Amino acid sequence: MGKPTGFMEIARQTSTELPPEERIQNFNEFHIPLPQDEQQAQGARCMDCGVPFCQAGMMIGGMASGCPLNNLIPEWNDLVYQGKWDLAVHRLRATNRFPEFTSRVCPALCEAACTCGYTTGSPVTVKENEHAIVEYGYESGLLTACPPPTRTGKTVAVVGAGPAGLAVADYLNKRGHKVTVYEREDRVGGLLMYGIPNMKLEKQVIDRRVNIMKAEGINFVTCADVGGRTPAHDVLDAHDAVVLACGAKQARDINAPGRDAQGIYFAVDYLTSVTRSLLDSGFSDGKAVSAKDKKVLVIGGGDTGNDCVGTAIRQGCASVTQLEMMPCPPTERTAANAWPEWPKVLKTDYGQQEAIAVFGSDPRIYQTTVKEFYKDEAGQVCGALIAKLESKVVDEATGRRAMVPTGEEFAIECNLVLIAAGFTGCQPYVAEAFGVDLTKRGTVADTKYATNVPHVFTCGDMRRGQSLVVWALREGRDAAAEVDKSLMGYTNL
């Protein structure tokens, strides 16, 4: 703790965001980092707590409190303040192999659990300190390829090149195993590449990291649909172990009349089409699902729904409405949601901010769902019947509550519908191809990341269900240790 009074003397200062009217003109990242000296001052705000909840990563009330990767946050906060950037890079990378991802897309569980935030109302800028450290590492040449000095002679196949797959591949390669990553898409990155829009995570950031992994000896095979066009038994026969890290990509659908209308898409398919067209041709190929001049209805109030709102606005939509089943959260913590739990409070994300700037109002309508889709004579969606919901006890014995219709309904016009209602588990064909068991939740059943099939492991959302990138990285790290132990009889990961 280089400056014991830092949290009292220095105000929280974050990066500058480009104004909504300016940033919606393109799909570029829109945060302007602080100058290095100002970022160093932010490091002084860390209190080096005796019990640093920021790095705890423990479950409280069913949600994570603090960093799931157990990042050494007080250490590198102080190193930032001291200007010891080289050492800060080293200590950050001790627990997080991909800070360039988490410093952009993580919701900052660390800051929600920050003691400084609890005592002063302004948490330490942990996420932006992390971003400054990793970008310094690249700019200074510290983050370059470092292949393992020896090889074990063991080979591992990783199926899926999302955050969990990249993490498990990186750790196993560092251990000396020969790793091949199979990805069914045309680019490496999984959710990071096609599920998160470019303005949140520019794809050159992914490519920069993947190029280092390639130089370190990891082999990437794209357009390889293992369990589909690429037989699972070929992959299993060619390797000593296989890790399934295919994510939770089975989208939750809306079971309503008119669902077969044209112009209704799952959010991930919409976002994928936009990013692929951007990367392939700068949109000149015309292959992106377009929201231009359309009245857009987004079903789902989470991060993916927000990404759809921001993407549709950048495409020039005529209007955008976002439905959220749950009630509007409070603006401040309630007594039932005490620190250091994750704060269940109202958040207006970048997409909603942009909708407010462009259309003059928040796009969200709470406690609503679609009862019916309307379509015109050509079969194109042209509107939706919206049902209002309320929370009621549906099981007197347990007190379980659910959102149920109130009977109040209203109609809206829309000619593009994006379903962002979450995911129900993994797409089962990969699991079936390998013969691994699934749980009732649609995830792969496991015991310490090992499936019921010998030498076949699993990690990430495919194992734990839909979650955050930071959890996928934690899963990959922990799974790598179990795979290594299976191959070598012990592990030093």
Regions found by a protein language model. Give the residues of each.
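Glycine-rich dinucleotide-binding loop and its adjacent helix/turn
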Residues: 132-150, 208-229, 251-315, 438-452
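Ferredoxin-type iron-sulfur electron-transfer modules in oxidoreductases and energy-metabolism complexes
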Residues: 25-38, 64-65, 69-104, 108, ...
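C-terminal catalytic lobe of FAD-dependent flavoproteins
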Residues: 12-37, 42-45, 366-368, 374-375, ...
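FAD-site-proximal beta/loop scaffold in flavoenzymes
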Residues: 260-293, 393-466
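Glycine-rich Rossmann-fold phosphate-binding loop(s) that bind the pyrophosphate
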Residues: 159-163, 300-302, 461
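Feature captures the FAD/FMN-dependent oxidoreductase FAD-binding
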Residues: 150, 155-159, 207-256, 371-385, ...
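A conserved FAD-binding loop/helix module that cradles the flavin
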Residues: 305-308, 315, 462-490
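Beta1-alpha1 glycine-rich phosphate/pyrophosphate-binding loop at the start
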Residues: 5-32, 41-44, 68-80, 90-92, ...
